[in-house]
């Protein structure tokens, strides 16, 4: 399939482009303001990038237009897509349809710390040999790219493509349960900003995660949200999509998130926070600057972290990822 991505230089849409390319699609795109790190990533991936919103930038043979949320009605490219009756979809919906089915989606939501927490969680899974897929709102130094499909490949619907031949026997055997789950996790930075000009829901409601981290909640995005309550409603919609077999990892110190859970919750909740509160997961600072801390789970110390990052906020990001 050939895709044109409108708004391709945004951190989210650039990640969508990387995933589409890895899946074997032909990918091109256009944007107005193009600069690193996304411009560098797109160039390294060999993706054609055209400047500006002229409808001439969209190849006539594109099968689908993927629309970023930075584009509104009145944008020349958007108006031409609508006038021509071209097939279009939002980036969040494309991700939900093309990448997330069959995966254990781990969504990282919150006003602050999403990119850091998503990166830490992905790194932990990678270090554990899980080969996760991911979409991060930036290019993490550990990975060199903002998005990757990961090691998981769903079983083929064809004749036993997913079976492993036994050497010298011409027979096949199914992979072990553990092997079949390698790479099944997909970690996504889950943004509360709206999806597209035609879909004003928060992007994260598309992802239907098995596990959601709710890192914090403050008033933000004044251009689309009237007040904190409006953002809380979107977080409530996210909570409603997490199955009862999943988990919610919630900042136990955040009163706005407590109010979200009070609106309704059907999923087991594990709370995290710094020492001094009654949480499932606690960080006890060894160094006041956050460069060393003890991780405590249900009152039992399970290990000490020493790392180069500083600050209480980064300790909370790490604790959420570990939980």
What are these regions (language model features)?
Residues 1-94, 153, 247, 255, ...:
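N-terminal leader/targeting and accessory segments in enzymes
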Residues 2-4, 12, 19-23, 102, ...:
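Nucleotide phosphate-binding/pyrophosphate-handling subdomain across enzymes
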Residues 5, 19, 91-140:
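Walker A (P-loop) phosphate-binding motif
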Residues 31, 50-53, 90-96, 134-139, ...:
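Beta-strand->loop->alpha-helix junctions that form or flank phosphate-binding loops
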Residues 56, 141-152, 182-219, 257-302:
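Extended acidic/charged loop-beta regions that coordinate divalent cations
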Residues 73-93, 206-215, 232-239, 268-272:
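A short, gly/pro- and small-residue-rich
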Residues 152-184:
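Intrinsic disorder/low-complexity segments
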Residues 212-215, 246-250:
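Conserved beta-strand/loop subsegment of P-loop NTPase cores
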């Amino acid at each position: 399939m050939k895709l044109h991505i409108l708004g391709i230089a945004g951190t989210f849409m650039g990640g969508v482009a990387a995933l589409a390319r890895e899946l074997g699609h032909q990918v091109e795109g256009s944007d107005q303001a193009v600069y690193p790190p996304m411009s560098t990533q797109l160039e390294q991936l060999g993706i054609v990038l055209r400047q500006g919103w002229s409808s001439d930038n969209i190849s006539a043979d594109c099968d689908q237009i993927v629309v970023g949320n930075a584009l509104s009605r009145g944008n020349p490219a958007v108006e031409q897509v609508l006038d021509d009756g071209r097939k279009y979809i939002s980036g969040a919906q494309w991700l939900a349809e093309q990448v997330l089915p069959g995966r254990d989606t781990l969504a990282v939501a919150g006003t602050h710390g999403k990119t850091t927490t998503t990166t830490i969680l992905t790194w932990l899974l990678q270090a554990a040999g899980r080969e996760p897929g991911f979409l991060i709102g930036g290019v993490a130094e550990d990975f060199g790219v903002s998005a990757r499909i990961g090691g998981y490949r769903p079983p083929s619907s064809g004749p036993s493509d997913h079976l492993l031949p036994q050497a010298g026997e011409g027979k096949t055997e199914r992979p072990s349960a553990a092997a079949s789950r390698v790479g099944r996790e997909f970690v996504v930075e889950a943004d509360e900003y709206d999806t597209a000009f035609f879909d004003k829901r928060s992007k994260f409601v598309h992802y239907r995660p098995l596990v959601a981290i709710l890192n914090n909640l403050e008033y933000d995005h004044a251009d689309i949200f009237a007040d904190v309550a409006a953002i809380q409603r979107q977080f409530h919609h996210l909570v409603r999509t997490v199955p009862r077999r999943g988990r919610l990892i919630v900042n136990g110190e955040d009163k706005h998130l407590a109010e979200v859970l009070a609106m309704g919750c059907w999923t087991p909740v594990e709370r995290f926070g710094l020492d001094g509160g009654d949480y499932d997961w606690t960080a006890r600072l060894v160094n006041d600057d956050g460069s060393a801390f003890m991780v405590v789970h249900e009152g039992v110390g399970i290990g000490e972290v020493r790392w180069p990052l500083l600050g209480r906020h980064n300790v909370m990001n790490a604790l959420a990822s570990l939980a």
